[in-house]
């Protein structure tokens, strides 16, 4: 599929929406983890170290997702975000019909 400049601008917005949903999910997961009670053999230091590890892992994931904005990765990015359910078919409603159908048939 050949994407026009307008398609690419729209897909950038769609990708941003999906990435922000993943960010929101991570923040909610991390907040729930931080606020849960300590286990029997866990303390504040252990919790801080786990949060640091999770943040480092998420940073790596987020940097990989930033590649979705590159022209050569847009189609892969939208497909991945759809498969992971960070995007829905409704998110593609602003795209040309040809583009929308291409992503929804995958």
Language-model regions, residue ranges each:
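Acidic, Ser/Pro/Thr-rich low-complexity regulatory regions
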Residues: 1-106
């Amino acid at each position: 599929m050949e994407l026009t400049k307008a398609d690419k601008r729209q897909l950038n917005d769609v990708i941003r929406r999906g990435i922000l949903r993943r960010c929101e999910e991570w923040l909610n997961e991390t907040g729930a983890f931080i606020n849960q009670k300590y286990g029997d053999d866990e303390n504040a230091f252990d919790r801080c170290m786990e949060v640091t590890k999770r943040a480092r892992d998420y940073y790596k994931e987020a940097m990989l997702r930033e590649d979705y904005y590159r022209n050569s990765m847009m189609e892969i990015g939208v497909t991945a975000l759809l498969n992971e359910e960070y995007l829905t078919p409704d998110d593609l409603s602003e795209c040309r019909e040809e583009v929308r159908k291409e992503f929804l048939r995958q």
